[in-house]
Amino acid sequence: MTGIGNREPEHGAGAHVGAAVSVPDAASIPHSPLPIPGARMRAPRIALIAGEASGDILGAGLIDALRRRYPDAEFVGIGGDAMRSAGCQTWFDASELAVMGLTEVLRHLPRLLKLRSAFRERVLAWKPDVFIGIDAPDFNLPVERWLKQRGVRTVHYVSPSVWAWREKRAEKIGVSADLVLCLFPMEPPIYAKHGVDARFVGHPMADAIAYQADREAARAKLGLSTSSTVLAVLPGSRHGEISRLGDTFFQAAWLVSEHLPNLHVLVPAANPGCKQLLAEQLSRSSLPVMRSHLLDGQARTAMLAADVVLLASGTATLEAMLVKRPMVVGYKVAPLTYRIVKTLGLLKVNRYALPNILANEDLAPELMQDDCTPERLCEALLDWFKHPEKVAGLQSRYLALHAQLRQDASARAAEAVAELLTQRELGIGNRESGGAGS
Protein backbone atom coordinates (compact mmCIF):
# COMPACT_ATOMS: atom_id res chain seq x y z
CA MET A 1 0.00 0.00 0.00
CA THR A 2 1.08 3.51 -0.62
CA GLY A 3 0.89 6.51 1.60
CA ILE A 4 2.79 7.29 4.78
CA GLY A 5 3.45 3.57 5.18
CA ASN A 6 6.01 3.22 2.39
CA ARG A 7 5.34 0.44 -0.05
CA GLU A 8 6.67 -2.89 1.03
CA PRO A 9 8.30 -5.18 -1.53
CA GLU A 10 5.38 -7.40 -2.46
CA HIS A 11 7.27 -9.82 -4.44
CA GLY A 12 2.49 -8.35 -2.96
CA ALA A 13 1.65 -10.57 -0.21
CA GLY A 14 7.38 -17.33 6.18
CA ALA A 15 10.61 -17.83 6.69
CA HIS A 16 12.77 -17.90 3.61
CA VAL A 17 10.02 -17.94 1.01
CA GLY A 18 12.19 -19.45 -1.65
CA ALA A 19 12.40 -22.61 0.43
CA ALA A 20 9.56 -25.10 0.66
CA VAL A 21 6.98 -23.72 3.04
CA SER A 22 4.06 -25.71 4.37
CA VAL A 23 0.96 -23.56 3.94
CA PRO A 24 -1.94 -24.75 6.09
CA ASP A 25 -5.49 -25.01 4.85
CA ALA A 26 -7.87 -22.51 6.40
CA ALA A 27 -9.58 -25.29 8.33
CA SER A 28 -6.34 -26.31 10.02
CA ILE A 29 -5.35 -22.83 11.20
CA PRO A 30 -5.74 -22.51 14.99
CA HIS A 31 -8.84 -20.53 15.56
CA SER A 32 -10.83 -19.85 18.74
CA PRO A 33 -14.42 -19.18 17.79
CA LEU A 34 -16.17 -17.09 20.41
CA PRO A 35 -19.83 -16.63 21.09
CA ILE A 36 -21.14 -13.18 20.33
CA PRO A 37 -20.52 -11.34 23.60
CA GLY A 38 -23.77 -10.73 25.40
CA ALA A 39 -23.71 -9.05 28.77
CA ARG A 40 -21.27 -6.17 28.52
CA MET A 41 -21.48 -3.15 30.78
CA ARG A 42 -21.37 -0.96 27.70
CA ALA A 43 -20.85 -1.24 23.96
CA PRO A 44 -17.18 -1.37 22.95
CA ARG A 45 -15.36 1.74 21.84
CA ILE A 46 -13.15 1.05 18.82
CA ALA A 47 -10.66 3.49 17.30
CA LEU A 48 -9.12 2.96 13.86
CA ILE A 49 -6.69 4.60 11.44
CA ALA A 50 -6.70 3.94 7.69
CA GLY A 51 -4.20 5.99 5.74
CA GLU A 52 -5.40 5.54 2.17
CA ALA A 53 -8.18 4.24 -0.07
CA SER A 54 -7.35 0.53 0.22
CA GLY A 55 -7.15 0.78 4.01
CA ASP A 56 -10.42 2.71 4.07
CA ILE A 57 -12.14 -0.20 2.29
CA LEU A 58 -10.59 -2.72 4.71
CA GLY A 59 -11.70 -0.58 7.64
CA ALA A 60 -15.26 -0.32 6.36
CA GLY A 61 -15.52 -4.10 5.98
CA LEU A 62 -14.18 -4.63 9.49
CA ILE A 63 -16.57 -2.06 10.97
CA ASP A 64 -19.53 -3.75 9.27
CA ALA A 65 -18.47 -7.15 10.61
CA LEU A 66 -17.90 -5.81 14.13
CA ARG A 67 -21.26 -4.03 14.02
CA ARG A 68 -22.95 -7.39 13.48
CA ARG A 69 -21.40 -8.57 16.75
CA TYR A 70 -21.77 -5.30 18.62
CA PRO A 71 -24.73 -3.34 17.23
CA ASP A 72 -24.16 -0.42 19.61
CA ALA A 73 -20.38 -0.20 19.23
CA GLU A 74 -18.81 3.22 18.73
CA PHE A 75 -16.18 3.77 16.04
CA VAL A 76 -13.89 6.80 15.69
CA GLY A 77 -10.62 7.54 13.97
CA ILE A 78 -8.99 8.51 10.69
CA GLY A 79 -10.62 7.20 7.53
CA GLY A 80 -12.36 8.01 4.28
CA ASP A 81 -15.78 7.83 2.69
CA ALA A 82 -16.12 4.05 3.04
CA MET A 83 -15.46 4.08 6.79
CA ARG A 84 -17.77 7.05 7.28
CA SER A 85 -20.53 5.23 5.39
CA ALA A 86 -19.97 2.24 7.69
CA GLY A 87 -20.60 4.47 10.71
CA CYS A 88 -17.15 5.64 11.77
CA GLN A 89 -16.86 9.17 13.15
CA THR A 90 -13.70 10.41 11.43
CA TRP A 91 -11.77 13.03 13.36
CA PHE A 92 -9.40 13.46 10.42
CA ASP A 93 -9.74 12.38 6.79
CA ALA A 94 -7.50 9.62 5.42
CA SER A 95 -6.33 11.97 2.66
CA GLU A 96 -4.29 13.86 5.27
CA LEU A 97 -1.97 10.84 5.49
CA ALA A 98 -1.77 10.12 1.76
CA VAL A 99 1.71 11.34 0.93
CA MET A 100 4.07 9.39 -1.32
CA GLY A 101 7.80 9.34 -1.79
CA LEU A 102 10.61 10.40 0.52
CA THR A 103 10.63 14.04 -0.61
CA GLU A 104 6.91 14.50 -0.08
CA VAL A 105 7.01 12.74 3.30
CA LEU A 106 9.83 15.00 4.49
CA ARG A 107 7.96 18.09 3.34
CA HIS A 108 4.85 17.06 5.26
CA LEU A 109 6.63 15.51 8.25
CA PRO A 110 6.00 18.35 10.76
CA ARG A 111 2.29 18.34 9.93
CA LEU A 112 2.08 14.53 10.12
CA LEU A 113 3.84 14.42 13.49
CA LYS A 114 1.52 17.11 14.83
CA LEU A 115 -1.53 15.22 13.55
CA ARG A 116 -0.29 11.96 15.08
CA SER A 117 0.30 13.60 18.45
CA ALA A 118 -3.13 15.27 18.40
CA PHE A 119 -4.84 12.03 17.44
CA ARG A 120 -3.23 9.83 20.06
CA GLU A 121 -3.97 12.31 22.88
CA ARG A 122 -7.57 12.64 21.76
CA VAL A 123 -8.09 8.90 21.36
CA LEU A 124 -6.55 8.18 24.77
CA ALA A 125 -8.97 10.66 26.37
CA TRP A 126 -11.82 8.90 24.52
CA LYS A 127 -10.80 5.65 26.30
CA PRO A 128 -11.09 3.05 23.53
CA ASP A 129 -11.37 -0.63 24.27
CA VAL A 130 -9.16 -1.38 21.27
CA PHE A 131 -7.19 0.54 18.65
CA ILE A 132 -6.80 -0.88 15.13
CA GLY A 133 -4.12 0.47 12.81
CA ILE A 134 -4.80 -0.52 9.20
CA ASP A 135 -1.62 -0.87 7.13
CA ALA A 136 0.45 2.41 6.94
CA PRO A 137 3.02 0.98 9.38
CA ASP A 138 5.23 4.07 9.51
CA PHE A 139 2.33 6.08 10.88
CA ASN A 140 0.32 3.44 12.74
CA LEU A 141 2.93 1.39 14.59
CA PRO A 142 4.17 4.34 16.69
CA VAL A 143 0.54 5.16 17.56
CA GLU A 144 -0.06 1.53 18.51
CA ARG A 145 3.08 1.40 20.64
CA TRP A 146 2.21 4.67 22.45
CA LEU A 147 -1.34 3.52 23.18
CA LYS A 148 -0.27 0.02 24.21
CA GLN A 149 2.13 1.52 26.74
CA ARG A 150 -0.88 3.29 28.24
CA GLY A 151 -3.00 0.19 28.52
CA VAL A 152 -4.98 0.19 25.27
CA ARG A 153 -5.29 -3.11 23.40
CA THR A 154 -3.84 -2.70 19.91
CA VAL A 155 -4.26 -4.47 16.57
CA HIS A 156 -2.25 -4.05 13.37
CA TYR A 157 -4.29 -5.05 10.29
CA VAL A 158 -2.16 -5.96 7.22
CA SER A 159 1.30 -7.24 7.99
CA PRO A 160 4.32 -5.54 6.47
CA SER A 161 6.19 -7.90 4.15
CA VAL A 162 8.33 -9.48 6.87
CA TRP A 163 8.59 -12.62 4.73
CA ALA A 164 10.42 -10.65 2.03
CA TRP A 165 12.89 -8.55 3.95
CA ARG A 166 13.86 -7.51 7.49
CA GLU A 167 12.13 -10.41 9.22
CA LYS A 168 13.23 -9.08 12.61
CA ARG A 169 10.61 -6.35 12.22
CA ALA A 170 8.09 -8.97 13.34
CA GLU A 171 9.40 -8.78 16.88
CA LYS A 172 9.28 -4.97 16.85
CA ILE A 173 5.74 -5.04 15.49
CA GLY A 174 4.81 -7.25 18.44
CA VAL A 175 6.03 -4.51 20.79
CA SER A 176 3.41 -2.21 19.25
CA ALA A 177 0.53 -4.60 18.55
CA ASP A 178 -1.18 -7.16 20.77
CA LEU A 179 -2.49 -8.82 17.61
CA VAL A 180 -1.50 -8.79 13.93
CA LEU A 181 -4.12 -9.61 11.30
CA CYS A 182 -2.45 -11.12 8.22
CA LEU A 183 -3.76 -11.32 4.65
CA PHE A 184 -1.48 -14.19 3.59
CA PRO A 185 -1.04 -17.66 5.14
CA MET A 186 2.78 -17.61 5.19
CA GLU A 187 2.87 -14.64 7.57
CA PRO A 188 1.66 -15.96 10.98
CA PRO A 189 4.42 -18.62 11.27
CA ILE A 190 7.03 -15.85 11.05
CA TYR A 191 5.39 -13.90 13.85
CA ALA A 192 5.09 -17.09 15.92
CA LYS A 193 8.89 -17.46 15.76
CA HIS A 194 9.11 -14.07 17.47
CA GLY A 195 6.38 -14.72 20.04
CA VAL A 196 3.81 -12.44 18.40
CA ASP A 197 0.10 -13.30 18.15
CA ALA A 198 -0.78 -13.17 14.44
CA ARG A 199 -3.83 -14.56 12.63
CA PHE A 200 -4.41 -15.34 8.96
CA VAL A 201 -7.78 -13.82 8.06
CA GLY A 202 -7.67 -14.12 4.26
CA HIS A 203 -7.62 -11.41 1.64
CA PRO A 204 -10.66 -9.15 1.07
CA MET A 205 -9.87 -8.99 -2.65
CA ALA A 206 -10.32 -12.76 -2.85
CA ASP A 207 -13.73 -12.36 -1.19
CA ALA A 208 -14.76 -9.63 -3.63
CA ILE A 209 -13.84 -11.40 -6.89
CA ALA A 210 -15.95 -14.29 -8.16
CA TYR A 211 -14.26 -17.62 -8.76
CA GLN A 212 -15.42 -17.47 -12.38
CA ALA A 213 -15.58 -13.82 -13.40
CA ASP A 214 -17.40 -12.83 -16.62
CA ARG A 215 -14.87 -11.97 -19.33
CA GLU A 216 -17.55 -11.39 -21.98
CA ALA A 217 -19.21 -8.76 -19.79
CA ALA A 218 -15.85 -7.04 -19.28
CA ARG A 219 -15.22 -6.97 -23.02
CA ALA A 220 -18.70 -5.63 -23.71
CA LYS A 221 -18.11 -2.86 -21.17
CA LEU A 222 -14.95 -1.85 -23.03
CA GLY A 223 -16.46 -2.18 -26.51
CA LEU A 224 -14.42 -5.24 -27.48
CA SER A 225 -15.71 -8.29 -29.31
CA THR A 226 -15.45 -11.76 -27.82
CA SER A 227 -13.16 -12.77 -30.70
CA SER A 228 -10.63 -9.95 -30.20
CA THR A 229 -7.05 -10.71 -29.17
CA VAL A 230 -6.37 -8.54 -26.13
CA LEU A 231 -3.32 -7.65 -24.06
CA ALA A 232 -3.63 -5.58 -20.87
CA VAL A 233 -0.55 -3.50 -19.99
CA LEU A 234 -0.15 -2.17 -16.43
CA PRO A 235 3.28 -0.57 -15.84
CA GLY A 236 2.34 0.48 -12.31
CA SER A 237 0.32 3.02 -10.36
CA ARG A 238 3.13 5.41 -9.46
CA HIS A 239 5.00 7.94 -11.51
CA GLY A 240 8.38 6.33 -10.79
CA GLU A 241 7.24 2.85 -11.78
CA ILE A 242 5.65 4.06 -15.00
CA SER A 243 8.74 6.10 -15.88
CA ARG A 244 10.96 3.02 -15.48
CA LEU A 245 8.65 0.45 -17.08
CA GLY A 246 6.21 2.13 -19.45
CA ASP A 247 8.41 2.52 -22.54
CA THR A 248 9.77 -1.01 -22.14
CA PHE A 249 6.28 -2.48 -21.74
CA PHE A 250 4.90 -0.63 -24.77
CA GLN A 251 7.85 -1.71 -26.92
CA ALA A 252 7.15 -5.28 -25.85
CA ALA A 253 3.46 -4.85 -26.75
CA TRP A 254 4.47 -3.55 -30.18
CA LEU A 255 6.70 -6.59 -30.74
CA VAL A 256 3.77 -8.84 -29.81
CA SER A 257 1.55 -6.96 -32.28
CA GLU A 258 4.06 -7.77 -35.04
CA HIS A 259 3.16 -11.43 -34.48
CA LEU A 260 -0.54 -10.77 -33.73
CA PRO A 261 -1.53 -7.93 -36.10
CA ASN A 262 -5.05 -7.49 -34.72
CA LEU A 263 -3.91 -7.14 -31.12
CA HIS A 264 -5.83 -4.71 -28.90
CA VAL A 265 -3.86 -3.16 -26.02
CA LEU A 266 -5.67 -1.98 -22.87
CA VAL A 267 -3.84 0.50 -20.64
CA PRO A 268 -5.66 1.43 -17.40
CA ALA A 269 -4.43 4.60 -15.68
CA ALA A 270 -4.70 4.78 -11.89
CA ASN A 271 -5.15 8.56 -11.79
CA PRO A 272 -4.95 11.66 -14.05
CA GLY A 273 -1.22 12.11 -13.45
CA CYS A 274 -0.50 8.53 -14.47
CA LYS A 275 -2.79 8.91 -17.48
CA GLN A 276 -0.84 11.89 -18.77
CA LEU A 277 2.48 10.06 -18.47
CA LEU A 278 1.09 6.90 -20.09
CA ALA A 279 -0.37 8.96 -22.94
CA GLU A 280 3.06 10.48 -23.60
CA GLN A 281 4.68 7.04 -23.62
CA LEU A 282 2.01 5.60 -25.91
CA SER A 283 2.51 8.47 -28.35
CA ARG A 284 6.22 7.56 -28.55
CA SER A 285 5.48 3.89 -29.16
CA SER A 286 4.76 2.25 -32.50
CA LEU A 287 1.46 0.77 -31.33
CA PRO A 288 -1.48 1.44 -33.67
CA VAL A 289 -3.58 4.25 -32.21
CA MET A 290 -6.88 2.63 -33.18
CA ARG A 291 -6.13 -0.50 -31.15
CA SER A 292 -4.55 1.16 -28.09
CA HIS A 293 -7.09 1.94 -25.38
CA LEU A 294 -6.05 4.28 -22.54
CA LEU A 295 -8.59 3.86 -19.75
CA ASP A 296 -9.55 5.88 -16.68
CA GLY A 297 -9.05 3.33 -13.91
CA GLN A 298 -10.86 0.04 -14.66
CA ALA A 299 -7.72 -2.03 -14.04
CA ARG A 300 -9.71 -5.09 -12.98
CA THR A 301 -12.03 -4.80 -15.98
CA ALA A 302 -9.03 -4.50 -18.30
CA MET A 303 -7.34 -7.56 -16.82
CA LEU A 304 -10.56 -9.55 -16.95
CA ALA A 305 -11.13 -8.60 -20.60
CA ALA A 306 -7.57 -9.52 -21.62
CA ASP A 307 -6.21 -12.79 -22.91
CA VAL A 308 -2.84 -12.06 -21.30
CA VAL A 309 -1.63 -9.39 -18.85
CA LEU A 310 1.75 -7.63 -18.76
CA LEU A 311 2.21 -5.88 -15.43
CA ALA A 312 4.55 -4.55 -12.80
CA SER A 313 5.30 -6.65 -9.74
CA GLY A 314 3.03 -5.71 -6.83
CA THR A 315 -0.54 -6.13 -5.63
CA ALA A 316 -1.82 -6.04 -9.22
CA THR A 317 -0.32 -9.51 -9.72
CA LEU A 318 -2.65 -10.82 -7.02
CA GLU A 319 -5.63 -9.24 -8.77
CA ALA A 320 -4.60 -10.76 -12.12
CA MET A 321 -4.36 -14.15 -10.42
CA LEU A 322 -7.82 -13.79 -8.89
CA VAL A 323 -9.38 -13.02 -12.29
CA LYS A 324 -7.49 -16.11 -13.58
CA ARG A 325 -5.42 -14.40 -16.26
CA PRO A 326 -2.01 -15.58 -17.46
CA MET A 327 0.53 -12.86 -16.83
CA VAL A 328 4.10 -11.80 -17.40
CA VAL A 329 5.62 -9.78 -14.56
CA GLY A 330 8.32 -7.18 -15.04
CA TYR A 331 10.00 -4.81 -12.62
CA LYS A 332 12.87 -2.35 -12.45
CA VAL A 333 14.20 -0.27 -9.59
CA ALA A 334 16.82 2.46 -9.63
CA PRO A 335 20.22 0.87 -10.45
CA LEU A 336 21.83 2.07 -7.22
CA THR A 337 18.95 0.69 -5.14
CA TYR A 338 19.22 -2.65 -6.92
CA ARG A 339 22.97 -2.88 -6.30
CA ILE A 340 22.58 -2.06 -2.61
CA VAL A 341 19.80 -4.61 -2.13
CA LYS A 342 21.72 -7.34 -3.97
CA THR A 343 25.04 -6.58 -2.28
CA LEU A 344 23.63 -6.50 1.24
CA GLY A 345 21.27 -9.43 0.67
CA LEU A 346 18.30 -7.47 2.02
CA LEU A 347 15.67 -9.43 0.11
CA LYS A 348 14.94 -12.89 1.50
CA VAL A 349 12.88 -14.14 -1.45
CA ASN A 350 13.83 -15.66 -4.77
CA ARG A 351 10.41 -14.93 -6.28
CA TYR A 352 8.76 -11.54 -6.59
CA ALA A 353 5.21 -11.94 -7.91
CA LEU A 354 2.59 -12.78 -5.29
CA PRO A 355 1.08 -15.74 -7.22
CA ASN A 356 4.52 -17.35 -7.41
CA ILE A 357 5.21 -16.70 -3.74
CA LEU A 358 1.85 -18.11 -2.66
CA ALA A 359 2.26 -21.22 -4.83
CA ASN A 360 5.99 -21.56 -4.09
CA GLU A 361 6.50 -22.23 -7.78
CA ASP A 362 6.92 -20.22 -10.97
CA LEU A 363 3.38 -19.86 -12.29
CA ALA A 364 4.06 -16.51 -13.97
CA PRO A 365 7.30 -15.53 -15.75
CA GLU A 366 9.23 -12.86 -13.82
CA LEU A 367 11.66 -10.60 -15.64
CA MET A 368 13.49 -8.26 -13.29
CA GLN A 369 15.97 -5.43 -13.80
CA ASP A 370 18.38 -6.23 -16.68
CA ASP A 371 16.21 -9.18 -17.78
CA CYS A 372 13.22 -6.86 -18.21
CA THR A 373 13.70 -6.06 -21.90
CA PRO A 374 11.11 -5.70 -24.69
CA GLU A 375 12.42 -8.82 -26.41
CA ARG A 376 12.31 -11.04 -23.31
CA LEU A 377 8.86 -9.75 -22.34
CA CYS A 378 7.55 -10.33 -25.87
CA GLU A 379 8.83 -13.90 -25.89
CA ALA A 380 7.11 -14.67 -22.58
CA LEU A 381 3.84 -13.03 -23.66
CA LEU A 382 3.71 -14.91 -26.96
CA ASP A 383 4.20 -18.17 -25.09
CA TRP A 384 0.85 -17.57 -23.34
CA PHE A 385 -0.93 -16.38 -26.48
CA LYS A 386 0.18 -19.39 -28.51
CA HIS A 387 -0.36 -22.15 -25.91
CA PRO A 388 -3.97 -22.08 -24.65
CA GLU A 389 -3.53 -25.52 -23.09
CA LYS A 390 -0.98 -24.02 -20.68
CA VAL A 391 -3.47 -21.30 -19.78
CA ALA A 392 -6.12 -23.88 -18.86
CA GLY A 393 -3.74 -25.63 -16.47
CA LEU A 394 -2.68 -22.34 -14.95
CA GLN A 395 -6.26 -21.30 -14.26
CA SER A 396 -6.87 -24.41 -12.15
CA ARG A 397 -3.84 -23.52 -10.01
CA TYR A 398 -5.07 -19.95 -9.64
CA LEU A 399 -8.48 -21.23 -8.60
CA ALA A 400 -6.92 -23.25 -5.77
CA LEU A 401 -4.97 -20.21 -4.55
CA HIS A 402 -8.12 -18.10 -4.75
CA ALA A 403 -9.94 -20.59 -2.53
CA GLN A 404 -7.08 -20.51 -0.03
CA LEU A 405 -7.31 -16.72 0.29
CA ARG A 406 -11.11 -16.52 0.25
CA GLN A 407 -11.87 -16.73 3.97
CA ASP A 408 -14.43 -13.94 4.54
CA ALA A 409 -11.61 -11.73 5.76
CA SER A 410 -13.71 -9.06 7.43
CA ALA A 411 -15.64 -11.62 9.49
CA ARG A 412 -12.46 -13.44 10.54
CA ALA A 413 -10.76 -10.17 11.43
CA ALA A 414 -13.80 -9.16 13.48
CA GLU A 415 -13.73 -12.51 15.27
CA ALA A 416 -10.08 -12.00 16.23
CA VAL A 417 -10.81 -8.47 17.48
CA ALA A 418 -13.81 -9.80 19.42
CA GLU A 419 -11.55 -12.34 21.12
CA LEU A 420 -9.19 -9.53 22.13
CA LEU A 421 -12.12 -7.52 23.50
CA THR A 422 -13.31 -10.52 25.49
CA GLN A 423 -9.82 -11.03 26.93
CA ARG A 424 -9.82 -7.40 27.97
CA GLU A 425 -13.25 -7.78 29.58
CA LEU A 426 -12.01 -10.77 31.55
CA GLY A 427 -8.67 -9.16 32.41
CA ILE A 428 -6.73 -11.78 30.44
CA GLY A 429 -3.43 -11.03 28.75
CA ASN A 430 -0.42 -8.86 29.42
CA ARG A 431 -0.87 -5.11 29.55
CA GLU A 432 1.83 -2.48 29.38
CA SER A 433 -0.04 -0.45 31.98
CA GLY A 434 -3.50 -0.11 33.38
CA GLY A 435 -4.38 3.09 31.54
CA ALA A 436 -7.24 3.98 29.29
CA GLY A 437 -10.37 2.04 29.28
CA SER A 438 -9.37 -0.28 32.10
From Swiss-Prot:
GO cellular component, one term: membrane
Pathway stated in the Swiss-Prot or TrEMBL entry: Bacterial outer membrane biogenesis; LPS lipid A biosynthesis
Domain of life (superkingdom): Bacteria
Catalyzed chemical reaction(s): a lipid X + a UDP-2-N,3-O-bis[(3R)-3-hydroxyacyl]-alpha-D-glucosamine = a lipid A disaccharide + UDP + H(+)
EC number assigned by the record: 2.4.1.182
This protein's record includes keyword Lipid biosynthesis: yes
Top EC category: transferase
Keyword entries, A-Z: Glycosyltransferase, Lipid A biosynthesis, Lipid biosynthesis, Lipid metabolism, Transferase
GO molecular function, one term: lipid-A-disaccharide synthase activity
Family annotation (SUPFAM superfamilies): UDP-Glycosyltransferase/glycogen phosphorylase
One Pfam family hit: LpxB
NCBIfam families assigned to the protein according to its UniProt record, in alphabetical order: lpxB
Family recorded in the similarity comment: Belongs to the LpxB family.
Function statement: Condensation of UDP-2,3-diacylglucosamine and 2,3-diacylglucosamine-1-phosphate to form lipid A disaccharide, a precursor of lipid A, a phosphorylated glycolipid that anchors the lipopolysaccharide to the outer membrane of the cell.
The name this protein goes by in its record: Lipid-A-disaccharide synthase
Highest classification ranks of the organism: Bacteria, Pseudomonadati, Pseudomonadota, Gammaproteobacteria, Lysobacterales
Gene behind the chain: lpxB
